[in-house]
């Protein structure tokens, strides 16, 4: 199974900006690795929740579309809300 996510590069950073994204049903994320600069991203929360129910989401190489370019990544970390069924933040590492 392959996973592809459309992403947007985040312009606003910080706690307040992240909270606004979460209220808008989006997930803040970070993409790093391969000797390149880290990039802050935004993903759709509902698509992430649906995909993370599959075990392959955590073990396979995923595709992120960042500024029209496909980037192969693996999930490095997932932060979840302690009570609600929500993903709070994702870390991706370039594959």
From Swiss-Prot:
UniProt cross-references to PANTHER family, sorted A to Z: RIBOSOMAL PROTEIN L25/GLN-TRNA SYNTHETASE, ANTI-CODON-BINDING DOMAIN-CONTAINING PROTEIN, RIBOSOMAL PROTEIN L25_GLN-TRNA SYNTHETASE, ANTI-CODON-BINDING DOMAIN-CONTAINING PROTEIN
Entry similarity comment: Belongs to the bacterial ribosomal protein bL25 family.
Record keywords: Ribonucleoprotein, Ribosomal protein, RNA-binding, rRNA-binding
Chain's gene name: rplY
GO molecular function: 5S rRNA binding; structural constituent of ribosome
Subunit structure: Part of the 50S ribosomal subunit; part of the 5S rRNA/L5/L18/L25 subcomplex. Contacts the 5S rRNA. Binds to the 5S rRNA independently of L5 and L18.
GO CC aspect terms: cytosolic large ribosomal subunit
Its job: This is one of the proteins that binds to the 5S RNA in the ribosome where it forms part of the central protuberance.
Gene Ontology annotations of biological process type: translation
InterPro entries (UniProt xref): Rbsml_bL25/Gln-tRNA_synth_N, Ribosomal_bL25/Gln-tRNA_synth, Ribosomal_bL25_long, Ribosomal_bL25_short, Ribosomal_L25_dom, Ribosomal_uL5_bac-type
Gene3D superfamilies: Ribosomal Protein L25, Chain P
Name of protein: Large ribosomal subunit protein bL25
């Amino acid at each position: 199974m392959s996973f592809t996510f459309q992403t947007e590069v985040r312009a606003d950073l910080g706690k307040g900006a992240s909270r606004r994204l979460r209220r808008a049903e989006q997930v803040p994320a970070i993409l790093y690795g391969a000797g390149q600069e880290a990039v802050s991203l935004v993903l759709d929360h509902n698509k992430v929740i649906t995909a993370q129910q599959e075990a392959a989401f955590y073990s396979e190489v995923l595709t992120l579309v960042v500024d029209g370019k496909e980037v192969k990544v693996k999930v490095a970390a997932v932060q979840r809300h302690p009570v609600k069924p929500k993903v709070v933040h994702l870390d991706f590492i370039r594959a």
